[in-house]
Amino acid sequence: MATRHQARTAVVGLLYAYDLGNENIAKFSDEILEEDKIRNKQRDFSHDLFDGTIENLEMLDAEIEKHLTDWDYDAIGRVEKAILRLGAYEILVAKTDRAIIINEAVELAKSLADEKSPQFINGVLDAIGK
């Protein structure tokens, strides 16, 4: 059975594809999640995260942008943006424990983004969570 971390990793991939302009990615999400062996409760968890993030995208982007220091929002990489959006959604909307989400986001950044991303993502999500 997939873990929540694996489910979040898949959601980052879906958000990344969405950001690239594939707005129909939701139609294929079951197949994508199945490829990653994300099933049952974790699949439902993934759908909730993806759908909730997309539904709140404008507000999440505004919150992220508000907490950037010395960064232009448009200059943030797409992977980093996907991780920030997911983390902001879980902190602000899903009300998941802030420390857990920041840790998850940092771990996602370590495995999916460049070496400077974990610290950047930690700082932004920490500011959002306060």
Swiss-Prot record:
Keyword Ubl conjugation listed: no
Keywords from the named record: RNA-binding, Transcription, Transcription antitermination, Transcription regulation
Top-rank lineage group of the source organism: Bacteria
GO MF annotation, one: RNA binding
GO cellular component: cytosol
InterPro entries reported for this sequence: NusB-like_sf, NusB_fam, NusB_RsmB_TIM44
Signal peptide: none
GO biological process terms on file: DNA-templated transcription termination; transcription antitermination
Record's keyword annotation contains rRNA-binding: no
Database matches in SUPFAM superfamilies: NusB-like
Its job: Involved in transcription antitermination. Required for transcription of ribosomal RNA (rRNA) genes. Binds specifically to the boxA antiterminator sequence of the ribosomal RNA (rrn) operons.
Family: Belongs to the NusB family.
Designated name of the protein: Transcription antitermination protein NusB
Record organism: Sulfurovum sp. (strain NBC37-1)
Gene field: nusB
